[in-house]
Amino acid sequence: MKENQKQHQVFIEGAGLSFTISENDTILGGILRSGVGIPYECNAGGCGSCKYTLIEGDVVDDFEGSAGLRSSDKRKNKHLACVSRPQSNCVIQINPDAQYAAKTHPKRVNATLQSVEKLTHDLWEFYFQSDHSARFLPGQYAKLGLPGVAGPRSYSMCNNANNDGRWGFQ
């Protein structure tokens, strides 16, 4: 996390839980990194599984036209945790559930693009090198922020976990 990013406290009403996140991080990212479990699937605003009610505070929704949020939800001050970012301290209402707690907590990793290969007319494979081991479980994916691309996008890892810091994606 960059030092110049504003930090905000997010309180989960009724659960006695809170966490601190950057205003550039999503509510879902903060929830998962804090070890709290909530239902979520797409992590991109399409499914609506991570819906919460904003009780106090201000958030920015990165995907206003999200299929996961109806106009009736918006009138009830509902937002999607995966595409909303805090702009102040917030109080939210969501139902934590231990069955959804992450086995590994998401973390930010900086890496350098090492190679790109076109596999088919619409499939590319690319590898990054980081200073940290590439530890992940089957089925996990990474949200990558790439220069020139609006917003992060989810990519599946295509290599095996390793201690060399090599991350492959398709």
Give a label for each model feature.
Residues 97-105:
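Intrinsically disordered, low-complexity Ser/Thr-rich linker and spacer segments
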Residues 11-14, 54, 146-148:
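Short acidic, glycine-rich loop/turn motifs
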Residues 30-39, 49-98:
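Iron-sulfur (Fe-S) cluster-binding segments and ferredoxin-like electron-carrier domains
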Residues 15-18, 88, 132, 149-151:
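Short acidic/polar mixed-charge low-complexity motifs
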Residues 1-39:
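N-terminal pre-ligand scaffold of iron-sulfur
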Residues 105-170:
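Ferredoxin-reductase
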